[in-house]
Amino acid sequence: MAIQVKNNIQWVGQRDWEVRDFHGTEYKTLKGSSYNSYLIREEKTVLIDTVDHKFSREFVQNLSAEIDLKTLDYIIINHAEEDHAGALTELMAQIPGTPIYCTENGIDSINGHHHHPEWNFHVVHTGDSLDIGNGKQLIFVETPMLHWPDSMMTYMTGDAVLFSNDAFGQHYCDEHLFNDEVDQNELFEQCQRYYANILTPFSRLVTPKINEILGFNLPVDMIATSHGVVWRDNPTQIVQRYLEWAADYQEDRITIFYDTMSNNTRMMADAMAQGINEVDPRVAVKIFNVARHDKNEILTNVFRSKGVLVGSSTMNNVMMPKVAGLLEEITGLRFHNKKASAFGSYGWNGGAVDRIQTRLMDCGFETTLALKAKWRPDGDTLAVCRQHGRDIARQWALSPSALTVSAPAVTAVQPASEPEVSCADADLGPRMQCSVCLWIYDPALGEPMQDVAPGTCWQEVPDDFLCPECAMGKEVFDPLSSEAK
């Protein structure tokens, strides 16, 4: 069933109440999702995106009930992922010559999924426009790596609607389409979950891209996303949230997550949480067992936190697998502005804590004292854990706390020193890493494909240099963490 969005714009997407997994099984969609497709009927008839491939036949049937498919003048594909463009093969079988407008990378992605290089592709770039009649145009804005290289947004003049692709969306299914019609707590919870788990690696790109769009000085009366609600009531509120989340976001909270074999590590977590609360009752402390909790909720809480405590029993001299897996995800999400520490119990060798502490440094976190406990914690050991929590609360405080609590001295493990890595020639300075795709520029090697000779330090690399992997500019590069001084 089509739903009117504004004037001659209709939603012709698909709700998916049952979906519980996204990106394989990596993202739990506990509130379902929607695949938002939009039909514009001005002098020209335009379709923006399709739906997930599993709804292809249903989508084409429903669209055929709205219009004669042969009257469709243009198809706009903002993003080629299967939950956006999945119905293209079914649709194009009916109207094979219809022009498809997308980015250059979009053609590569669409062909990679659908294998139809003969389709009528038209490449668009930022600032390009398409006249759709009645004095209205579609203006295109490339948004590479938000969150795929092919991504773009489409703005419709006259109605002032921004078709924003994945940005500002959420995996959230509701019978209502607009943001002012749904539960606000649920909505913003899902917005933050979506940002933390999907867009955080690209936070460095969010603010400049938003500022670029705002720099066009175009009014935005509505933001039509690819998933979840359409923002019609104060649509810029979600833009403001994104600017906050992209700015090394943190709240006054600490997340503790762990896995345990005999509840010994859980006892340590509980005691440390008590100690934190004694010193600073204002801080929110959340504890999660990674074997029993939704990992995306844990990751969202880590994103929100000023600090994280990670615990594991030692098993075969390493950390437990679910903790290792979550730390690998955190490394990829590249959260910033976080403090961290490891803890855990052991029997005869406490290798898990040392490995966690090293992985926390790999995540880019500022690590502080780690804590080990042998066998099952007794009263004295739990007192040490509570004191450790108190020390953490003081060290990580966002604002000074007047409250002091005396307790037994703590026996703690100092964080392992980070190994120093140097370039082949120290005078060339550190290697530089792209914060988007993690490609590394080595001054000793240069980049011959862009005429950057071996032995060229980063300061002398031309300003128009682009990352060979993701085509982003110099501004997204940072010194390789192990070489930063």
UniProtKB/Swiss-Prot annotation:
Residues annotated for Fe cation 1 binding in this entry: 79, 81, 147, 166
Keyword Transport: yes
Binding positions for FMN per the UniProt entry: 260-264, 342-369
Pathway: Nitrogen metabolism; nitric oxide reduction
CC cofactor: Fe cation; FMN
Taxonomic superkingdom: Bacteria
Domain Rubredoxin-like: 429-480
Zinc metallo-hydrolase: annotated segments: 30-210
Record bears the keyword Lyase: no
GO cellular component, one term: cytoplasm
A Pfam family reported for this protein in Swiss-Prot or TrEMBL: Rubredoxin
Domain Flavodoxin-like: from-to ranges: 254-393
Assembly with partners or alone: Homotetramer.
Protein name from the UniProt record: Anaerobic nitric oxide reductase flavorubredoxin
Species, as recorded: Serratia proteamaculans (strain 568)
Gene name, Swiss-Prot/TrEMBL: norV
